[in-house]
From Swiss-Prot:
This is Small ribosomal subunit protein uS2. GO terms for cellular component: cytosolic small ribosomal subunit. It is found in: Cytoplasm. It comes from Paracoccidioides brasiliensis (strain Pb03). Component of the small ribosomal subunit. Mature ribosomes consist of a small (40S) and a large (60S) subunit. The 40S subunit contains about 33 different proteins and 1 molecule of RNA (18S). The 60S subunit contains about 49 different proteins and 3 molecules of RNA (25S, 5.8S and 5S). Interacts with RPS21. Required for the assembly and/or stability of the 40S ribosomal subunit. Required for the processing of the 20S rRNA-precursor to mature 18S rRNA in a late step of the maturation of 40S ribosomal subunits. Pfam families: 40S_SA_C, Ribosomal_S2. Belongs to the universal ribosomal protein uS2 family. The keyword Cytoplasm applies. Signal peptide: none annotated. One of its GO terms (biological process) is translation. Keywords: Cytoplasm, Ribonucleoprotein, Ribosomal protein. GO terms for molecular function: structural constituent of ribosome.
Length: 295
């Protein structure tokens, strides 16, 4: 990392640098825009352009100082048409008081005063100059300064402050917005000092797939845990001695169980059957013996 041109109080800590590297904020694309060349550290053998993390931190601090200089936070508009940045801009707006536009940017928001969504911000911050080009173009018509998260292949036309970073990864985008919000709160005095940790974790700024979260909840509700299955088995008496107690002792010991005679069974067979068959025989023989019966 190149030596920093910031005052010592704004220097990045080793933890900040480790977080930027872990989120892959230093990995750009294979294409290089000529205006992004000053932020380039080197090009890897596979063609990936590596961004200078020191320049990234300097631009984060510069952007935070610009944001903190605006008296009314509602005059700041944060924009992200890229899905990976929509959750981040909403969290940034909630923590700093800015106005968020997550999703499609309606043309005419900054130029057509007849529309309901007309806004007159003093500063806009975009996640990607390529996907948010409509907002940058309209800001140039009405002289609104623009801060943008720029990759090595991002167009920098009409961008006043470019924060060099990877603006295509979900973790890189979330981390940059989280660091920007933290620096703004430090400059405003919301956080006591730079040594105090922010109680908001960076995971809140990361993109979450709604379908993946829904499927995860369904799986958790369908599959019971091992502890629940064990508890249910114990309560139903199917574990340990209870299972043997419920089973027949004779079968468990492997000894044949002698049959129990039913009282009166043989007597019923010998008497009842003979008694019931005698009248039937007589009734069958009577018609043949009687000559008066006509068939």
């Amino acid at each position: 990392m190149a030596p920093s041109n910031l005052p010592p109080v704004f220097n990045a800590t080793s933890q900040d640098i480790e977080m930027l590297l872990a989120a892959q904020c230093h990995l750009g694309s294979k294409n290089l825009q000529v205006h992004m060349e000053p932020y380039l550290w080197k090009t890897r053998p596979d063609g990936i352009n590596v961004i200078n993390i020191g320049k990234t931190w300097e631009k984060i601090v510069l952007a935070a100082r610009i944001i903190a200089a605006i008296d009314n936070p509602a005059d700041i508009c944060v924009i992200s048409a890229r899905p990976y940045g929509q959750r981040a801009v909403l969290k940034f707006a909630a923590h700093t008081g800015a106005v968020a536009i997550a999703g499609r940017f309606t043309p005419g928001n900054f130029t057509n005063y007849i529309t309901r969504s007309f806004k007159e911000p003093r500063l806009i911050i975009v996640t990607d100059p390529r996907t948010d080009s409509q907002a940058i173009k309209e800001a140039s018509y009405v002289n609104i300064p623009v801060i943008a998260l720029c990759d090595t292949d991002s167009p920098t036309e009409f961008v006043d402050v470019a924060i060099p970073t990877n603006n295509k990864g979900r973790h890189a985008i979330g981390l940059i917005w989280w660091m920007l919000a933290r620096e703004v709160l430090r400059l405003r005095g919301t956080l006591a000092n730079r040594e105090s940790e922010w109680d908001v974790v960076v995971d809140l700024y990361f993109y979450r797939d709604p379908e993946a979260e829904e499927n995860k909840e369904i799986e958790e509700t369908k599959v019971p845990g091992a502890e629940e299955v064990g508890a249910a088995a114990i309560e139903s008496g199917l574990v340990g001695d209870s299972w043997q107690a419920q089973a027949t002792p004779g079968f468990s010991a492997g000894v044949a169980v002698p049959g129990t005679a039913v009282p009166g069974w043989e007597a019923d067979v010998s008497t009842d059957w003979a008694a019931s068959s005698a009248p039937a025989a007589e009734t069958l023989a009577d018609p043949a013996a009687d000559p008066s019966v006509k068939w």
